Amino acid sequence: MSTTIEIPESSKVAKGKAVAVVAPARPGGWKKGVAIMDFILRLGAIAAALGAAATMGTSDQTLPFFTQFFQFEASYDSFTTFQFFVITMSLVGGYLVLSLPFSIVAIVRPHAVGPRLFLIILDTAFLTLATAGGASAAAIVYLAHNGDQDTNWLAICNQFGDFCAQTSAAVVSSFVAVVVLVLLIIMSALAIGKP
């Protein structure tokens, strides 16, 4: 047996207005957007760093004329600074690939501080490495373009134009990676610092 209670609607009951209660926005919701941007910037930095290493590593030019005893060739492995550049940019690119899972964790858990702190520390270390490699290669590229009259070093880019164009492009690409790493560090620091 079931008992039902009928309540008729009455027009005598005054209708009132209730206060709309909206759930407050979760603080720090913007951190997920920062984490997604972090991931995208990491992909760009990977392309810039590995592109710089590949461009420098394949820079090679042989002049069409040669003598009986000499052949004029310019290659990245003729300069230890360029070898250092290829190694450092390869290391930076490899680190950035290995940092992608931590960036994904920051997307899934935007309020987790551990992965961001870990990335800030390693990003800073590899930023230093990328800056050192890029700056040292930039100095040699400058000498290749302009030479130095005081030390009697001649500019070689008049003869080895393709080689100089490739090395210059590699240096520019490395500094793009450096700028992206700086942006990554700033974004991660802001995400950790603000609630």
UniProtKB/Swiss-Prot annotation:
Predominant cellular place of this UniProt entry's protein: membrane
Sequence ranges on the Extracellular membrane side: 55-83, 138-171
Ribonucleoprotein among keywords: no
Signal sequence interval, chain numbering: none
InterPro entries: CASP/CASPL, CASP_dom, CASPL
Protein localization: Cell membrane
Domain of life: Eukaryota
Function: Regulates membrane-cell wall junctions and localized cell wall deposition. Required for establishment of the Casparian strip membrane domain (CSD) and the subsequent formation of Casparian strips, a cell wall modification of the root endodermis that determines an apoplastic barrier between the intraorganismal apoplasm and the extraorganismal apoplasm and prevents lateral diffusion.
Record's protein name: Casparian strip membrane protein 1
The organism of origin for this protein: Glycine max (Soybean)
